[in-house]
């Protein structure tokens, strides 16, 4: 799905292998807060290796004696990885259950603490990653490329995981927009997200191709750093250009839905021209009830560091909620993901 999308730093020449083993992809979830210690929800921090999020949630539900719907999470995480994440269990008026019964070589309970609010999808600050890429080839320019990514970021593309194996989530969305009924709410949400993500990626790629990844268009919608607050100005002012250059604001692209574009003027015209061939997709998203939203055009990994030794690269960084680690790797090298006989299940936070 991402083969035709533009690269911010040009197509990479280095090659490597991602996830040769689970320990090569480490994800530590950061909620951005500590559970308060009281309330009717139990937050459980779990370390899992080679297990998917939904399956572990089912084990927790059985151990706690509750319905599966009573167990929630902030985000799905890659299966073939070592991940630490939080689960929430709704247990009003009940004592804490013995969750140690689910522990095994691949599952460890790290922390259990009560909280007064439900753990919801997206209810997190972000994720810390430690990636080990092996079998490096043609890596002569890798050091300078790493530096460029640390300084300028990468396209904030939605990763392959969003679209399903072979793009099957998009095929399902297309069928749904053509009238096929999808009764499963989770599947319906998955297919809508895939369609919306494809349109976002198309606009980001088009801006990069036109040399507009770091350049303001009149009417661009920008987002304040560290928040989801957005605004647009009719013209390109020196003040706004300086704020963009300093990182105080970020360029954005639309996540399609009902309502008017938050951009205006030349920027809105550009976005509409890119999406003109996707009229049926836009119409389908609007009829499904999704509202317009914005997402940063670029993604700058935080606290990025690396160690390059021979044919192995160890790369660590932090990404905010909604960002994909694989989008960072894509800009860095042509990484072949080891096939372990199952589809990786991951959310936007773990690239997963």
UniProtKB/Swiss-Prot annotation:
Record's keyword terms, sorted: Isomerase, tRNA processing
Its job: Responsible for synthesis of pseudouridine from uracil-13 in transfer RNAs.
Domain TRUD: residue ranges: 153-299
Protein name per UniProt: tRNA pseudouridine synthase D
GO cellular component assignments: cytosol
InterPro entries to which the protein is assigned, alphabetical: PsdUridine_synth_cat_dom_sf (IPR020103), PsdUridine_synth_TruD (IPR001656), PsdUridine_synth_TruD_CS (IPR020119), PsdUridine_synth_TruD_insert (IPR011760), TruD_catalytic (IPR042214), TruD_insert_sf (IPR043165), TruD_pseudoU_synthase (IPR050170)
Similarity comment text for this entry: Belongs to the pseudouridine synthase TruD family.
Catalytic activity as recorded in UniProt: uridine(13) in tRNA = pseudouridine(13) in tRNA
GO biological process: tRNA pseudouridine synthesis
EC number(s) recorded for this UniProt protein: 5.4.99.27
Keyword check for Nucleus: no
Molecular function via GO: RNA binding; tRNA pseudouridine(13) synthase activity
Catalytic residues as annotated in Swiss-Prot or TrEMBL: 78
Record carries keyword tRNA processing: yes
Source organism (scientific name): Aeromonas hydrophila subsp. hydrophila (strain ATCC 7966 / DSM 30187 / BCRC 13018 / CCUG 14551 / JCM 1027 / KCTC 2358 / NCIMB 9240 / NCTC 8049)
HAMAP family in the record: TruD
């Amino acid at each position: 799905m991402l083969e035709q999308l533009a690269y911010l730093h040009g197509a990479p020449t280095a090659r490597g292998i991602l996830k040769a083993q689970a320990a090569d992809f480490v994800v530590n979830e950061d909620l951005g807060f500590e559970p308060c210690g009281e309330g009717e929800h139990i937050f459980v921090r779990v370390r899992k290796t080679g297990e998917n999020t939904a399956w572990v949630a089912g084990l927790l539900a059985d151990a706690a004696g509750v319905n599966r719907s009573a167990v929630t999470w902030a985000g799905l995480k890659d299966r073939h990885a070592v991940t630490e994440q939080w689960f929430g269990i709704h247990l009003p008026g009940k004592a804490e259950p013995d969750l140690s019964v689910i522990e095994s070589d691949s599952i460890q309970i790290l922390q259990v603490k009560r909280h007064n609010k439900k753990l919801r999808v997206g209810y997190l600050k972000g994720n810390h990653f430690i990636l080990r890429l092996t079998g490096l080839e043609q890596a002569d320019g890798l050091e300078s490329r790493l530096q460029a990514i640390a300084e300028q970021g990468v396209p904030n593309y939605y990763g392959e995981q969003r679209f399903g194996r072979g793009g099957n989530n998009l095929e399902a969305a297309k069928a749904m927009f053509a009238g096929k009924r999808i009764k499963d709410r989770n599947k319906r949400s998955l297919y809508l997200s895939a369609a919306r993500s494809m349109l976002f990626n198309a606009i980001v790629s088009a801006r990069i191709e036109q040399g507009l990844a770091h350049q303001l268009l009149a009417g661009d919608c920008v987002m304040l750093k560290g928040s989801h607050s957005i605004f647009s100005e009719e013209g390109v002012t020196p003040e706004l250009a300086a704020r963009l250059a300093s990182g105080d604001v970020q360029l954005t692209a639309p996540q399609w839905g009902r309502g008017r574009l938050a951009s205006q003027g030349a920027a809105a015209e550009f976005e509409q021209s890119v999406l003109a061939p996707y009229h049926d997709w836009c119409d389908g998203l609007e009829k499904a009830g999704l509202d317009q939203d914005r997402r940063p055009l670029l993604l700058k990994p935080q606290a990025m560091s690396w160690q390059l030794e021979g044919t192995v690269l160890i790369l660590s960084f932090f990404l905010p909620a909604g960002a994909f680690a694989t989008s960072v790797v894509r800009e860095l090298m042509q990484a072949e993901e080891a096939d372990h006989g199952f589809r990786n299940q991951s959310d936007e936070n773990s690239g997963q």
